[in-house]
Amino acid sequence: MRDSKKYVVKIPNFYLVKTVTGVEEWAVATHFEPVQARYALPCFDEPAIRAKFNFKVTVPNELTSLCCMEVTDKSVDGANTTYSYATTPSMSTYLLAVCCGKYDFVEGSTKSGIKVRIYANRGEGMGFNFCEPPTLGSRD
């Protein structure tokens, strides 16, 4: 896709997340398999047909945007932050992943230097100590 049109995503993937403290907050996440990618972008929803994708996501400053690729640029313009992501490898549309919400993260590296981040809903990072050691060790 080589245009810069803005698409309004009209797919049923807006979730009301209840935090551990009982607060309800909205989070947005894609769930394109098996054939829902066509509701978000013009494409052939066929696993054998692949393409490379570039994502740029703008969210209010209090939210974090995550994508299936690494952030290449992050810019703040007033009340909004725009995240730009690296180009994906050639892939099927159902593998695309983007989510936005209030998240915290911890970051570490494997012994071989691969950067790993673990995300949780903001304020719910108590599980980080449980999942970080096995996650970082799983790639070495």
Q: Where does each model-flagged region fall?
A:
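Acidic/His-enriched low-complexity segments
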Residues: 1-140
